[in-house]
Amino acid sequence: MARKRTSKNDPLRMYLNYVRKLQTMGDAYDESAKYRIANFENGFKSLHMVENEFKQYLANVIDEAIKSGASPQDLPYVNEIKLALMKIFTSWLKYSNEKLGANEIAINVAGTATMTLTENLYGTRVSCEEAVSLINSIFAVWVGVEPFEAEEREGACLVTPRSPLPPVPISSPTGFSAPIQEVLQAKSPEEIIGVKGGA
């Protein structure tokens, strides 16, 4: 006598269940895709806004440092390397956003500074030591450390870290600052403006 096939082992039923699961998985993936795209767009907008605010704040910090005498004496030749400084400090934003530790941030920013200053100081009246002194003075104002030392060798401006460099604090019109991770996790521009991190 043939053994009766149970519904649990019925190949047709098993196949239909499998197809149903595939369809459900596809629907779930499509649904989650909406959230993934929305999160990507929101994250991109937040990062773009933070970069713009960061660059504006950086420009203000550099200008204030220059006016207060924390930079080389000759204002015109400091302006000659302003774009190079912007590139170095923007790399600080990049490495902060990668959630690196303070030591790794210092090492990576020092590498960017070495390449950028070696390329951009040629033909200016700014020495390697003066440029790094200016960078340190800005970091001292911003995060309370002077992380780099400089050595000019065979035309290259070698920048090496001497202390850890904390992640970027983002300024806000409220007068507070916050780590970039907190800023990017905010759900709206209002939260970014109002977020309270460090003083």
From Swiss-Prot:
Self-assembles to form a helical, filamentous nucleocapsid. Together with capsid protein 1, wraps arounds the DNA and maintains it in an A-form. Capsid proteins probably maintain the DNA in A-form by non-specific desolvation and specific coordination of the DNA phosphate groups by positively charged residues. This certainly protects the viral DNA under conditions such as the extreme desiccation of its host. It comes from the Viruses. Heterodimer composed of major capsid protein VP4 and major capsid protein VP5. GO terms for cellular component: helical viral capsid. Keywords: DNA-binding, Virion. Its main location: virion. This is Major capsid protein VP5. It is found in: Virion. The keyword DNA-binding applies. GO terms for molecular function: DNA binding. The N-terminus projects into a DNA groove.
